[in-house]
Amino acid sequence: MQNLAPRINKTHTAIGPRPQHSVARAIAGSMLLSATLIVAATAEEYPNRPVRFVVAFAPGGITDIIARLVGERLSERLGQTIVIDNKGGAAGALGAKLVSTSEPDGYTFLVTTTAIAVNAAASPISIDPRTQLVPVAMAASSPTIIAARTPATSKSLPEFVRNLKQDVLTYASSGAGTVEHLTAAYLLKGISGIAATHVPYRSGAEAINAVIGNHVNLSSTPVGSAISVVQNHQLQILGVASHKRVAMLPDVPTFGESGLADMD
């Protein structure tokens, strides 16, 4: 974006209301809690009208939840309405494309994930985030997990595959080319004797519902998207893509502990 001015874009959820702080500081202070990137531009006289967050995934997933939490806090700090606009599709590429072609006036932000880096190399509608967007803040990290519908007697991903007793396994993610898709594809490729078919959805929430509804065998999703259904005993996590176990899930092994690739 040519001029350094703040940016935000339309769901149609409005988050309604402080003063002329640096928008970069305001967002960074509110965003230390996610695995999501807020990509935007930065302005001088700001804001004098509602700001728009374009969320690159469908409602209900971890990216959407983070956008709403950040939007609420940012609205309080800036004294202006934040409008949440979910533009899911093409693993986040549609939302990124929309923001990249919007006015660089400081009123349109993209809320996305690390999928934006994969899209730049693989998606036919991708943009170059290095030249077409200005990064504002990284929120936090939510490692990828692979989970099965309960009750599942298996305690790890290799054990689940061995007990499946079928030649083809299906797994869901929030879209083709997302980190969750590529993580699961890589891990399942390392387990012999099974063919894995990817079923893409528009958000982590939809991918989780697919496995709960028994439409697919597994779901690959950020741990933040799955924690509530795990606590409700609807989902069992078979492994986490991290060098060490997640504090809130101390009994869930890392994939490295299960004999698969050690990743973070």
Question: Residue locations for each model-derived region?
Answer:
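C-terminal lobe and pocket-closing loops
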Residues: 141, 226-264
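Extracytoplasmic "Venus flytrap"
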Residues: 53-66, 90, 172-179
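Short, well-ordered beta-strand elements
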Residues: 49-58, 82-83, 108-111, 134, ...
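Alpha-to-beta junction loops
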Residues: 80, 102-110, 167-169, 212-220, ...
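Bacterial N-terminal signal peptides
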Residues: 26-37
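Short helix-initiation/N-cap motifs at beta->coil->alpha
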Residues: 87-95, 141-142, 198-209, 222-225
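Beta->alpha turn/N-cap motifs
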Residues: 111-116, 204, 221-226, 241-243
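Hinge/capping helix and adjacent helix->loop/strand transition within the periplasmic-binding protein
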Residues: 101-107, 120-206, 255-260
